[in-house]
Swiss-Prot record:
This is Large ribosomal subunit protein bL31B. GO terms for cellular component: ribonucleoprotein complex; ribosome. It comes from Halalkalibacterium halodurans (strain ATCC BAA-125 / DSM 18197 / FERM 7344 / JCM 9153 / C-125). It comes from the Bacteria. The keyword Ribonucleoprotein applies.
């Protein structure tokens, strides 16, 4: 890699704000907030709104969209049977 053109890649802690779940990962993202991790080191803290701990795909609490309601409204709008 060419020196001086790539951002610094370092360890950061990501925190899911909806569940409080935290995980340590590598990233180029930076933050003014820091947190002390389980290993005793201090890392930058990145707050995210959704992660694998709260996303419906990973939690199994998926909500299926009801397409039948849209079809019924279309039929009613155009007087179809």
């Amino acid at each position: 890699m060419k020196p001086g053109i790539h951002p610094d890649y370092k360890k950061v802690v990501f925190m899911d704000t909806s569940t409080g779940f935290k995980f340590l990962s590598g990233s180029t993202k930076t933050s003014n907030e820091t947190i002390e991790w389980e290993d005793g080191n201090t890392y930058p803290l990145i707050k995210v709104e959704i992660s694998s701990d709260s996303h419906p795909f990973y939690t199994g609490k998926q909500k299926l969209a009801d397409a039948g309601g849209r079809v019924d409204r279309f039929k009613k709008k155009y007087n179809l049977k």
